[in-house]
UniProtKB/Swiss-Prot annotation:
Miscellaneous remark of the record: This function is generally fulfilled by the C-terminal part of HisG, which is missing in some bacteria such as this one.
Keyword Chaperone in annotation: no
UniProt subcellular location: Cytoplasm
GO cellular component, one term: cytoplasm
GO BP terms: L-histidine biosynthetic process
InterPro entries: aa-tRNA-synth_II/BPL/LPL, HisRS-like_core, HisRS/HisZ, HisZ
Assigned protein family: Belongs to the class-II aminoacyl-tRNA synthetase family. HisZ subfamily.
Name of the featured protein: ATP phosphoribosyltransferase regulatory subunit
UniProt keyword terms in alphabetical order: Amino-acid biosynthesis, Cytoplasm, Histidine biosynthesis
Known partners and oligomeric status: Heteromultimer composed of HisG and HisZ subunits.
Keyword Cytoplasm: yes
Pathway in which this enzyme or protein is active: Amino-acid biosynthesis; L-histidine biosynthesis; L-histidine from 5-phospho-alpha-D-ribose 1-diphosphate: step 1/9
Function noted in UniProt: Required for the first step of histidine biosynthesis. May allow the feedback regulation of ATP phosphoribosyltransferase activity by histidine.
Amino acid sequence: MNRWLLPEDITDVMPAEACKVESLRRAVLDLYQSYGYELVAPPILEFLDSLLTGTGSDLNLQTFKLVDQLSGRTLGLRADMTPQVARIDAHLLNRADVTRLCYAGSVAHARTPVGSSAREELQLGAEIYGCATWEADLEAITLLLKTLSVAGLEKVYLDLSHAGILAGILDGQSLDKETIEALYGLLQSKDRPRLGEWSTCLPENVAKALVALIELNGPCAEVLAKAKKELPKHAAIDKALADLERLVSAAANLSANVELSIDLADLRGYQYHSGVMFAAYVDRLPQPIARGGRYDHVGQAFGRPRPATGFSLDLLTLANLSPLNVRKMAITAPWVEDAELSKAIAALRDKGEVVIQVLAGTTLEAAEYQCDRELVKQGSSWEVKKK
């Protein structure tokens, strides 16, 4: 076996890409800070029971597991940072008021996620805790759109959904976990014939509503009007539609480059979310570049229920799609023993310039830098000249 081989769907990030990723990471985290978000850095390893608290079975399947040599307990290599950040808010910070947290760190998946070609991601996200109103959802969506704008992705397609609609339709039905997951799969695939067959064991009004969800996607106004007519009257459904209507009205003016739509069958993470859900799509990527929504019940697993909303995305994917050119301009300098040269180089670096000293007997091959200037000795001083 070749020693340089990596596990399947695990890759190295090369210099030019790493430079772009880091540039975006800094810019995005600075953006979040300007909105009042505080950066947290949870550990990449945790005890498994803590790591999976308040999450669904999908995360358990995606988590690498190993035994702690000190305690003998099972550890998990995180596959999602969101539960960790919820733990920090609920258990460690323990604040009564609104808390805004952001994060950026590596996550690993035991299985390659559907629609992806990588089992390792650089997850970046932002969460708002302590606010149960639609304004927090709007802020999360606004910040997501700003994130994509920072990366140079101006044309965005934003899909909205709501976990409360399916909860209202299934209210009073005794369905086990496996049945719910099967239903979720049929809704995601929009397989109307199979869903019709599957739902024959349910009351007629429930079966009819489930099948209707598949067709409830498209322009916001049309979908909302159709949903009010075709979905059953239920407090949870009425509230969900009202939430979406209010959010659509507020989000319509966020950006002229954002196309809003609703897809009530897009319920990925249904067991995790408790309210508004959203997914952002961009050109050249068939799956969402970012997902988010409300998940008010997660903090309850840590003994302190707190309303929460937010989003996350893979920074590596964002960098790959970003049209921005972050290749840095640089200055070359010879490697000679000269006190004045050393002072000149130090002064330039203090100003933020990249100065690369070319070692004796070598040629410069730093492809990620464009060396357009050089330090040249003029009399007794060193000056920057264009090449």
